[in-house]
């Protein structure tokens, strides 16, 4: 189907850039930048018709809405309803959102910058098994280091790192595979997969010519919740590099994924748990979505 084919066509192209984050608050989705004067958030574009200088507002994963009144307008050609974005902004005002019943807020913001975020749906293991030799190789088995993983809105958000050859434009493919073949009681098992193709630090004579590349992806998990249910336990699996790129380590984390707007919160543990974090200034490659 078109949806299945689309899963294989997303690519990440890495280019070198220096990123520095100073500190963050207690919510996994929102980071403070520049001494607490601005924020970094995930959200989706939402059409707005209120005389705003932007054609779109941003609906954060917590349901609150960001309305641009200063700074960069969101009027670029690729802007569309529900486009997922990662935004840098400061809040200049707020009021209660009277358009809904959820008690959300409207935050009026000065927008400094934004990127669109790679969004995908899980690939089912049964689909891979239909042509296992080709699809298993295409989806990849290369390590991927998970920096952060959490549920936000209808998504599993993952911020990750991968080794990138200095100056390379090699494409990397990222997917999430749902195990629908082996039963795991009530828990849904998903595995983060990475295909680095020829860009592997332990091959050839280029072992030392690599830097860490940073990327982000959001997986829409609504399809993994069984019919008639509003939430499901989830176990996330991945393989990452150890202390050096010649070692690999199997990792896992778990939590409860709850459908949006059901009124349920699920049990706050693992991937659902808010936790205080410090993000230090580091020199890494930023993986840009194509």
Regions found by a protein language model. Name each.
Residues 3-8, 14-48:
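Bacterial Sec-dependent N-terminal signal peptides
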Residues 46-58:
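Short aromatic-glycine-enriched beta-strand elements
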Residues 62-78:
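Beta-strand/loop nucleic-acid-binding surfaces
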Residues 77-103:
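Flexible glycine-rich surface loops and low-complexity tracts that mediate binding to linear polymers
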Residues 78-80, 197-243:
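Short, solvent-exposed, Trp/other aromatic-anchored flexible loops in extracytoplasmic proteins
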Residues 95-161:
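Surface-exposed beta-loop interaction hotspot
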Residues 139, 143-208:
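Short helix-loop boundary/capping segments
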Residues 243-290:
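Short beta-strand elements
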């Amino acid at each position: 189907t078109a949806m299945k084919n689309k899963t294989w066509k997303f690519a990440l192209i890495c280019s070198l850039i220096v990123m520095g984050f100073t500190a963050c608050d207690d919510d996994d989705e929102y980071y403070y930048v520049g001494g607490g004067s601005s924020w970094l958030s995930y959200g989706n574009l939402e059409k707005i018709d209120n005389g705003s200088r932007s054609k779109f507002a941003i609906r954060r994963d917590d349901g609150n809405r960001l309305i641009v009144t200063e700074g960069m307008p969101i009027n670029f050609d690729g802007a569309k309803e529900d486009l997922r974005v990662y935004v840098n902004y400061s809040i200049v005002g707020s009021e209660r959102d009277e358009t809904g019943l959820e008690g959300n807020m409207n935050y009026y913001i000065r927008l400094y910058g934004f990127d669109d975020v790679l969004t995908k749906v899980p690939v089912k293991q049964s689909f891979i098994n239909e042509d296992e030799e080709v699809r298993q190789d295409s989806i990849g088995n290369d390590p991927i280091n998970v920096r952060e993983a959490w549920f936000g809105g209808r998504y599993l958000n993952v911020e990750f790192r991968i080794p990138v050859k200095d100056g390379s434009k090699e494409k990397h493919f990222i997917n999430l595979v749902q195990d629908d073949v082996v039963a795991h009681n009530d828990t849904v098992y998903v595995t983060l997969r990475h295909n680095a193709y020829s860009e592997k630090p332990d091959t050839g004579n280029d072992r030392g010519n690599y830097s860490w590349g940073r990327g982000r992806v959001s997986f829409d998990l609504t399809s993994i919740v069984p019919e008639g249910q509003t939430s499901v336990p989830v176990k996330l699996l991945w393989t990452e590099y150890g202390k050096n790129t010649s070692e690999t380590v199997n990792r896992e984390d778990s939590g409860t994924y709850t459908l949006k707007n059901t009124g349920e919160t699920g049990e706050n543990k693992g991937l659902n748990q808010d936790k205080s974090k410090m993000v230090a200034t580091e020199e890494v490659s930023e993986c840009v979505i194509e």
